[in-house]
Amino acid sequence: MKVKIAAVGRLRAGPEADLVSDYLDRFGKTGRALGLGPVTVHEVEARKGGMAAEGELLGKAVAGSQIVCTLDERGKVLTSPDFANLLGKWRDEGRSEAAFVIGGADGINPALRAQADYSLSFGKMVWPHMLVRVMLAEQLYRAASILAGAPYHRV
């Protein structure tokens, strides 16, 4: 199952970009044997039209994806093993691509949120959208490690 990350804004060179790149590379290597990956990142411009304009661009970026999952403070809070099981379930159902949507500073357009198949939250706190990319990349790698039985995830 391919994975797409559609996000508002450009991730410039720096620690966040380094972390995202590292975790997505790890996910690619670990996930390959599990039928997960590769990951593609589709960045859309932050727009003056706010959420509506960004939502339109994000919607186009994920068109055709079999699963669309928003990352939103109103979403479901999962444990890392539950997230791994969710990815495994989507893969086992034969879904060819799961797309994760990260909104801009104002969040995700309500119309796009309503169309999503799933909504995920990294907790009740609000996170900067650039940090959410790092957190998602790490959780994708952690999920692949859990599914592979690798020792990365310890409890």
Short names for language-model regions:
Residues 1-31:
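N-terminal beta1-alpha1 ligand-phosphate binding loop
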Residues 1-3, 37, 115-117:
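Short glycine-/polar-rich loops that comprise or flank the Walker A/P-loop
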Residues 5, 69, 103, 136:
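Conserved RecA-like P-loop NTPase ATPase core
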Residues 6-8, 42-44, 101:
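Short hydrophobic segments within beta-strands
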Residues 11, 73-76, 104-107:
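Short glycine-rich anion-binding loops that position phosphate/pyrophosphate groups of nucleotides
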Residues 15-17, 79-81, 110-112:
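Short glycine-/acidic-enriched loop or helix-start segments at secondary-structure transitions
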Residues 32-98:
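S-adenosyl-L-methionine/SAH cofactor-binding core of RNA-modifying enzymes
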Residues 106-154:
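Structured adenosyl-cofactor binding patch, chiefly the S-adenosyl-L-methionine
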